[in-house]
C-alpha cells in the first residue's frame, strides 16, 4: 500500500481521520487496526503534518499528535494545532468519520487539571470542534487494559461527563469505544467504523478495517 505525505487525491470520495494527543497510542492503534492491509506511515521523529494512505476511494489520514510534544517548542505545537484545524475545515466535505483517540484512564484527570486553570483541554476542544462542523466523531478510549473490570463503567461515565455527554456512558456507545491497542482489543472501534460505512452503503470497504 502506497503512502505519502501528500497522498494522491484522485478519486477520493471519503476520508477517515485519526486525531489525538501525541502520547495516547494513536500509532499503535493504526498499526493494529489496519496492519498490513493499509500502511499508514509513521515517519521517524515527531510527525508535524498529516500522513495518508489511500485504498479504493477512501483516504485514511493520521493527523499529527497535538498538545505537548517532547522536544518541540510550544509555538510549534500551536502551529501544529492550527494546521490540524485548517486541514479539517478545508476537507470537511469529504471527511466522513473522525476517530479521536484519548488515554481513557488518564482522561478525566487531564481534563480536570486543565479546568482548574480555566482552560479548555485540547481533546475536549477538538471533540466539540469536529461535531460543530458536522463530522461524525468516534472517541476511542485507549489503554483500557489498565483499568480493572469493575472500574471500567465508572471511568467511562467520567469520560462521558468530561466530553459533555450525560452519563451513563452506555447511552453513547455509538460514540465512545473502549479499546486497548496494545492488547489488540479494537472490537468496539471496528464495529462502530463498520456501522458507519454500512450506513454509507460502503460495505465494500470492510475488508480494509
Swiss-Prot record:
PANTHER family: ENGB-TYPE G DOMAIN-CONTAINING PROTEIN, MSS1/TRME-RELATED GTP-BINDING PROTEIN. Mg(2+) binds at residues 27, 47. Belongs to the TRAFAC class TrmE-Era-EngA-EngB-Septin-like GTPase superfamily. EngB GTPase family. HAMAP family: GTPase_EngB. Residues 12-203 form the EngB-type G domain. Signal peptide: none annotated. This is Probable GTP-binding protein EngB. The gene is engB. It holds the Pfam family MMR_HSR1. Its cofactor is Mg(2+). GO terms for biological process: cell division. One of its GO terms (molecular function) is metal ion binding. CDD domains: YihA_EngB. InterPro entries: G_ENGB_dom, GTP-bd, GTP-bd_ribosome_bio_YsxC, P-loop_NTPase. Keywords: Cell cycle, Cell division, GTP-binding, Magnesium, Metal-binding, Nucleotide-binding, Septation. Necessary for normal cell division and for the maintenance of normal septation. GTP binds at residues 20-27, 45-49, 62-65, 142-145, 179-181.
